[in-house]
Amino acid sequence: MKLSNIKSKEVVRILQKQGFEIKRQSGTHIIMRNNGKIVVVPIHKQIIPIETLKTIEKQSGINFREIIS
């Protein structure tokens, strides 16, 4: 799977495996938290844009490229 073809559900699943918990949903965004880190995942589109995914990587400290390879 290419990094540019990752879906919102997959991002949420990866974050949960890394210890993030869903705290709430605000409209079309899921707010997740782990040890003070807050990550916002948009769920209004099937595939997350690459720039948004880079922001999620920065917020979470997780490298999705390593996990999905």
Question: Could you describe each region identified by the protein language model?
Answer:
Residues 1-69:
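Basic nucleic-acid-binding interfaces
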